[in-house]
């Protein structure tokens, strides 16, 4: 595991848990909540000195980049602590876009997953009350090595007992190794 250099970009990617179902069952509620959601995301990303990607993949998902990993982790925590109903964010934080996307995709709504590389650079500078919980090792992509997988914890956040959203092949590899 290598430490993230101070000048390396840290990615924060988020998606909404069950987005398609929510849009199908309550499109008016989702549309009404979307302006507040977007304003809140924009506020917390800017507060941390981050930049939102101009090309958003989904209207209720986003990508942001930060110069400092601590700012990305703080932004993720603030977003998870803020009521954003009906949006429940699945957040990934890492130093490469593909790895961040993978973390985002295996997280549950209300959960933030952080790579070991990023965690090692923020461990001494977490937001007040925040801790990191080791969840095992995870391959971050076909070309990236395995990383320690950490969950951002805080007394104001839910505790997760469910397994992560992983394809069976990935889950089997983690259980065997």
Give residue ranges: language-model regions.
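Key residue(s) within conserved catalytic/signature motifs
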Residues: 1, 43, 47-48, 78-84, ...
């Amino acid at each position: 595991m290598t430490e993230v250099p101070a000048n390396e970009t840290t990615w924060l990617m988020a998606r909404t848990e069950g987005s398609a179902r929510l849009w199908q069952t309550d499109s008016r509620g989702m549309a009404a909540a979307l302006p507040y959601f977007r304003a809140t995301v924009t506020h917390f990303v800017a507060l941390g000195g981050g930049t939102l990607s101009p090309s958003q993949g989904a209207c209720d998902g986003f990508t942001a980049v930060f110069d400092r990993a601590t700012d990305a982790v703080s932004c993720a925590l603030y977003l998870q602590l803020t009521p954003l109903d009906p949006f429940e964010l699945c957040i990934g934080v890492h130093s490469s876009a593909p790895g961040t996307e993978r973390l985002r995709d295996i997280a549950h709504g209300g959960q933030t997953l952080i790579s070991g590389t990023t965690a090692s650079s923020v461990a001494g500078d977490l937001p007040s009350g925040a801790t990191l919980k080791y969840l095992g090792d995870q391959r971050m992509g076909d070309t990236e090595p395995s990383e320690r997988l950490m969950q951002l914890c805080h007394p104001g956040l839910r505790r997760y007992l469910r397994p992560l959203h992983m394809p069976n092949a990935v889950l089997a590899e983690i259980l065997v190794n």
